[in-house]
Amino acid sequence: MDGVDVVISEIRRLSLSVIGSITVPYKKKLRTALDRVVLNNEPLTIHSYAVLDVEIGKEFAEAVNYALQEFGIKNNRIIAVGSHGQTLRHSPSSAPPYSLQIGDGATIAALTNITCISNFRSLDIAKGGQGAPLVPAFHEWCFSSEDKERSILNIGGIANVTILNSDNTHPLGFDTGPGNCLMDEWTKLHLGKPYDKGGTWASSGKTIPLLLESLLDYDYFKKDIPKSTGREEFNLRFLREKITSTSMRSASSENIQATLLELSPIRLLLH
């Protein structure tokens, strides 16, 4: 949730080229509002939800217009804006399952004067899917091979992997667990920075085996694939509960950061 990523690409039948990409940080007011809802689980009134939906849509549109200006591209050259939105809650295992995103597509279309395609996840969930990760179909288009099996890894806030078989079966994609989200929140809490640049803080600490074991012994990691998760599950509340349950409240913050750094690759390997 650091900001809005915009990629301008040209896609032909058998090729894709990136014309340019930028990241536009969220305005502080919007980032604070998102943190309260996503990370602190604060309730929203219908009015507050609607306002935030439109405001995030405006933020997305401003980022698109800025990117077009930066790379000297007129909006009439763009076929469509694809926006998967900002996730507020992802709950594919609830009854009924759902995934809720904001960033009003109509607002994006109106302010950019470009067709906007949005709400990518709901149909997949309605048909029994997870609604996440979104990239397996794209990975299949880009990287599938008739004689090689391939795995494509994406480490963002949440890490996900796509497995492509060589027998033309459907790709398998799922979230392995936290990527950078826990480390980023811990860094923000203790250093006041959005992330641990270069991993320098984590490298100054040492892994705490007992805490790592407790983190790995979590229900999500025991679920069968395909599966998906998000920040509503892996957040500071989750981390603090693990720290308390292992009596590690007096542990140094850098050792906890080092332990979180160990968590992500271990979960990737265990899958």
Roles of regions detected by a PLM:
Residues 46-103:
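Short beta-strand-loop/turn "lid" adjacent to the catalytic site in phosphate-handling enzymes
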Residues 2-27, 172-269:
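Conserved ATP-utilizing enzyme core subdomain
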Residues 81, 108, 264:
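Divalent metal-coordination and catalytic microenvironments
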Residues 7-66:
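Glycine-rich nucleotide/cofactor/substrate-binding loop typically near the N-terminus or early
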Residues 59-62, 66, 107, 111, ...:
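Alpha-helical scaffold segments in soluble metabolic enzymes
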Residues 92, 96-99, 110-194:
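Phosphate-binding/catalytic loop of phosphoryl-transfer enzymes
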Residues 61-69, 139-144, 262-270:
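Generic structural signal for well-ordered alpha-helical scaffold segments
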